[in-house]
A protein has these predicted regions:
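Acidic/aromatic-lined carbohydrate-recognition and catalytic surfaces
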Residues: 2-182, 186, 199-254, 264, ...
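Loop/helix patches that line or flank the sugar-binding groove of alpha-linked glycan CAZymes
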Residues: 6-7, 229-232, 238-241, 245, ...
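Short catalytic/ligand-binding loop motif for oxyanion handling, primarily in non-cytosolic enzymes
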Residues: 24, 57-61, 104-111, 200-203, ...
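Hydrophobic residues within beta-strands of alpha/beta enzymes
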Residues: 49, 192-194
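Active-site clefts of carbohydrate-active enzymes
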Residues: 216, 315-335
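Beta-strand-rich binding/interaction modules
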Residues: 509-528
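C-terminal beta-strand-rich structural cap/linker in extracellular carbohydrate-active enzymes
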Residues: 533-549
Length: 549
């Protein structure tokens, strides 16, 4: 089947199922809850959903620890519920991509239960076992090896100890994942978001790492020697037979890495999630090590990939997901007075770059980070482990508290605010994670009734995006003021047609005469988060112009 590259025209909405909508009032979101809200998504204007894991799981890491790839977690529903959801999405012109977690499974998966029984078990080499561990550490701040007394051996886990890494060197493992991918594509699923996909190949020497601080040994397990071979094999043997897309989560990858992963004729991934732009307010790409946001640094990072992938590869455009904190209050937009304006500014600035937009649930109404009274309110496994690690370091309590509050994955996992009722319309029972008090004024129902709301701005933005899709998809990008510390101004040019974005990332009025450079063009304002339009931009004002001859 010919791949139509439909992902280049997609507007993708991420659903984190346990926090989206609870249909049976058990405090946990579910598939029937998603079905209830499909008309809302259709009205928003998106045309694809990325669904975080709904597979069978003990939920040690909220579904990223899978015990059966071909079953649905019972709290989320049944396979019949899933099939109905997929059918109802397709009826509304909405495609579905699923999370594919292929670097690790749950330790409760049948493969691992067998693997740990004995050294000569047929499933032994499905995982990575060593008689002695090296010094690698993983992404949750722990040692990356866990001792198992049954066979007096250690298994590798780059995430939680209940998430053992699978051994992609084993051809049987690769066959298993091809079969899993085919199973879901045959159901009609439209593609996959591939979780930490650039970790699947490890350097087989298993050398000790040199970095004494974080992710010890990462040079030996990130972008490993056979990564491209494995991805090409999966594409050749399975994906190429379907009109589907893949987006890879590729941590700590460079521009050159991403070119290799996404260049069309290499047949590996459609695009990747690159996190450089979400790391401009931290050190070393580690969200817990905070530093002040710099717009100049932010632009430089985005420019690198806009220019670097213009002729080869493809960009993903995002601020938020289930691992990132909320964008409102971040990226120099932490002035509560301008919460609405800054949310609109962020949307306009990001989504007219070249690439595929990803919107995370609640982002379209300006949901904020989790409101906590104590660090004990955070229940995420990563947060708990990192907090333990930070408490052992020579850091002040104030710094640790701020880091945990800003960095916790729970920030984006607060249940969706549908209305201002006790549990925000998410459920009639106490949710698995508490809702925010600001549900009283940040919720879908109120947003739908307010013409100037963030939600209605997103709807308008998506309509504009579709109407000017040729420029958005193919227009040449140029950053017009790369060294300006407060303004982000860029153009997308396609022949004599230009989309011009002018954004003020500050809480003060700023004069901007950029339009003087386009006097020979006819001017039309397509989007504006204020009622006025002049060469003096108001705080957090963002304007999208259409210029034509």
């Amino acid at each position: 089947m010919k791949n139509t590259n439909w992902f280049k025209d997609a507007i993708i909405y991420q659903i984190y199922p346990r926090s989206f909508k609870d249909s049976d009032n058990d405090g946990m979101g579910d598939i029937k809850g998603i079905i209830e809200k499909l008309d809302y998504l259709k009205e928003l204007g998106i045309n694809c959903v990325w669904l975080s894991p709904v597979y069978e799981s003990p939920m040690d890491d909220n579904g990223y620890d899978i015990s059966d790839y071909k079953k649905i977690y019972s709290t989320f529903g049944t396979m019949e519920d899933f099939d109905l959801m997929l059918s109802e999405m397709h009826k509304r012109g909405i495609r579905l991509i699923m999370d594919l977690v292929a670097n690790h499974t749950s330790d409760e998966h049948y493969w691992f239960k067998e693997s740990k029984k004995s050294k000569d078990n047929p499933y032994r080499d499905y995982y990575i076992w060593k008689d002695k561990p090296n010094n690698w550490t993983g992404f949750f701040g722990e040692k990356a090896w866990e001792y198992d007394e049954t066979t007096d051996s250690y298994y590798l886990h780059l995430f939680g100890k209940k998430q053992p890494d699978v051994n992609w060197e084993n051809e049987l493992v690769r066959k298993e994942y091809k079969d899993i991918i085919k199973f879901w594509l045959d159901k009609g699923v439209d593609g996959f978001r591939c979780d930490v996909i650039n970790l699947i190949s490890k350097d087989q020497r298993y050398k000790n790492g040199l970095n004494p601080l974080i992710l010890v040994g990462k040079k030996y397990y990130i972008n490993g020697p056979r990564l491209h071979e494995y991805l090409n094999e999966i594409n050749r043997d399975v994906l190429s037979n379907y009109d589907c897309m893949t987006v890879g989560e590729t941590v700590f990858s460079t521009l050159d890495d991403i070119k290799l992963l996404t260049k069309e004729d290499r047949n590996e991934l459609s695009m990747v999630f690159n996190f450089d732009h979400t790391s401009v307010d931290n050190y070393l790409g580690v969200k817990w090590l905070m530093r002040k946001f710099s717009l100049k640094r932010f632009k430089k990072t985005l420019d690198k990939y806009q220019y670097g992938l213009k002729d080869e590869g493809w960009n993903s455009l995002f601020y938020e997901n289930h691992d990132q904190r909320r964008s409102v209050g971040r990226f120099n937009t932490d002035d509560d007075k301008y919460r609405v304006e800054s949310a609109k500014l962020l949307a306009t600035t990001m989504y007219f770059l070249k690439g595929t937009p990803f919107i995370y649930q609640g982002q379209e109404i300006g949901m904020t980070n989790m409101q906590v009274n104590s660090l004990d309110d955070f229940i995420d496994i990563e947060t708990i482990n990192v907090r333990k690690t930070m408490n052992k370091l020579p850091l002040t309590k104030k710094y640790i508290d701020k880091s945990i509050k800003n960095g916790s994955r729970d920030n984006s996992r607060v249940p969706m605010h549908w209305d201002d009722s006790e549990y925000a319309g998410f459920s009639n029972s106490k949710p698995w994670l508490k809702v925010n008090e600001n549900k009283s004024f940040i919720n879908v129902k109120q947003s739908q009734n307010d013409p100037s709301s963030i939600l209605n701005y997103y709807k308008k933005l998506i309509k504009v995006y579709k109407e000017y899709g040729d420029i958005v998809r193919d227009g040449i990008y140029k950053d017009l003021l790369p060294n300006d510390k407060k303004l982000f101004t860029y153009e997308r040019r396609l022949g004599d047609k230009i989309l011009l974005v002018v954004s003020n990332f500050s809480n003060s009025n700023i004069k901007c005469d950029i339009l003087d450079n386009y006097k020979e063009f006819n001017k039309e304002v397509l989007l504006n988060n204020y009622d006025n339009e002049s060469n003096e931009l108001k705080p957090y004002q963002s304007i999208l112009y259409y210029l034509s001859k």
